[in-house]
Swiss-Prot record:
Residues 280-302 are annotated as: Disordered. HAMAP family: Sulf_adenylyltr_sub2 (MF_00064). Belongs to the PAPS reductase family. CysD subfamily. Its EC number is 2.7.7.4. With CysN forms the ATP sulfurylase (ATPS) that catalyzes the adenylation of sulfate producing adenosine 5'-phosphosulfate (APS) and diphosphate, the first enzymatic step in sulfur assimilation pathway. APS synthesis involves the formation of a high-energy phosphoric-sulfuric acid anhydride bond driven by GTP hydrolysis by CysN coupled to ATP hydrolysis by CysD. This is Sulfate adenylyltransferase subunit 2.
Length: 302
C-alpha cells in the first residue's frame, strides 16, 4: 500500500520538529527565544508537539524592553501558566536605569540597548549555546540569506560570509566555548503558511492581531496605538478611534497598526491572499537606516 503523501503544512511541520529535536539532542544548553508574536506562538506549538507528552526540555526566554504592549505581557504569562514551560525574562538593567525609551532616544538606540544588548546579556548570563528564533526567510532580505543553523561568534555577531553549508538538511552545530548557533526552525515557512497553520492547529494568539476599535494617532503615515500613559504626542497630534489590527508586534511606540476588518483567522487568511505589502512595513525599527536589519544582526540582534 502506497504511503500517504504529506500536505505542504505537514511537510513544514515535520521539518521544523526535526530541527527542534536535533538541537535539543545536540546542544548542551539550548533556549527558545519567545517574542510573544505569531511566529513565536507557532514555534512554541511545534516544540510542545516535538516532545509530547513530555515537557519542553529547555527554557523560553523573553527579552523585555519595558515597552511591549500590555496585552503581549498578559498573554505571555497566561501561556506559561497554561502550558507549564520554564519562562525566563530579562531586561537590560543599565538601559532601565538610564531610562532608555523610543521617544527620547530614538528607535535605533532603544533597539540596540534594550533588545540587542539585552539579548546578549541574557545569553551570556545563562551560557546558552543555541537559541531558537522565529525568523523566516520571506520576511526580509537579510533573513533570506540566513542559514537554519546561523553561526555566531563569541560576541554573538553574525557574519554572512562565515556560515556553513547545509546540504540535504544536514546541519553543523560544532561550536567552541563562547560561540553559539541561532536556530531558525521556521526558515522555510511563509507568512501565509504561518496563518494557515495557526488556523489548522487552533493556536492561541495575542488579540492585537485581530481587527477591533482602537485609539491610534497618525504619525509619519503610520498608525500608532496608545497603550499606556507614557505615549507622547507631538504638537497637533490627537488620538482617533479606528478599526485596526497589527500584522506584526513589538514595542508599541515602534509598531504601526493597519486598517483592517479582519477580526477572525478566516478573514486574516483571506486578507493575506490579497495583500501586496510587506509584513514588516509596520516595524519602524526597520527604517532606521539603509540595510538596517542586516547591521542589527551583525551586532547580535536575532
Amino acid at each position: 500500500m502506497a504511503g500517504r503523501e504529506l500536505s505542504h503544512l505537514q511537510q513544514l511541520e515535520a521539518e521544523s520538529i526535526q530541527i527542534i529535536r536535533e538541537v535539543a539532542a545536540e546542544f548542551d544548553n539550548p533556549v527558545m527565544l519567545y517574542s510573544i508574536g505569531k511566529d513565536s506562538s507557532v514555534m512554541l506549538h511545534l516544540a510542545r508537539k516535538a516532545f509530547y507528552p513530555g515537557k519542553i526540555p529547555f527554557p523560553l526566554l523573553h527579552v523585555d524592553t519595558g515597552w511591549k504592549f500590555k496585552e503581549m505581557i498578559a498573554f505571555r504569562d497566561a501561556q506559561a501558566k497554561k502550558f507549564g514551560f520554564e519562562l525566563l525574562t530579562h531586561i537590560n538593567p543599565e538601559g532601565l536605569a538610564q531610562g532608555i525609551n523610543p521617544f527620547d532616544h530614538g528607535s535605533a538606540k532603544h533597539t540596540d540597548i534594550m533588545k540587542t544588548q539585552g539579548l546578549k546579556q541574557a545569553l551570556n548570563q545563562y551560557g546558552f549555546d543555541a537559541a531558537f528564533g522565529g525568523a523566516r526567510r520571506d520576511e526580509e532580505k537579510s533573513r533570506a540569506k540566513e542559514r537554519v543553523y546561523s553561526f555566531r561568534d563569541r560576541h554573538h555577531r553574525w557574519d554572512p560570509k562565515n556560515q556553513r553549508p547545509e546540504l540535504w538538511r544536514t546541519y553543523n552545530g560544532a561550536v567552541n566555548k563562547g560561540e553559539s548557533i541561532r536556530v531558525f526552525p521556521l526558515s522555510n515557512w511563509t507568512e501565509l503558511d504561518i496563518w494557515q497553520y495557526i488556523y489548522q492547529e487552533n493556536i492561541e494568539l495575542v488579540p492585537l492581531y485581530f481587527a477591533a476599535k482602537r485609539q491610534v494617532v497618525e504619525r509619519g503615515g503610520q498608525l500608532i496605538m496608545a497603550d499606556d500613559e507614557r505615549m507622547k504626542l507631538a504638537e497637533g497630534e490627537q488620538f482617533k478611534e479606528e478599526v485596526v489590527r497589527f500584522r506584526t508586534l513589538g514595542c508599541y511606540p515602534l509598531t504601526a497598526a493597519m486598517h483592517s476588518e479582519a477580526d477572525s483567522l478566516e478573514k486574516i487568511i483571506e486578507e493575506m491572499l490579497l495583500t501586496r505589502s510587506s509584513e514588516r512595513q509596520g516595524r519602524l525599527i526597520d527604517s532606521d537606516q539603509s540595510a538596517s536589519m542586516e547591521q542589527k544582526k551583525r551586532q547580535g540582534y536575532f
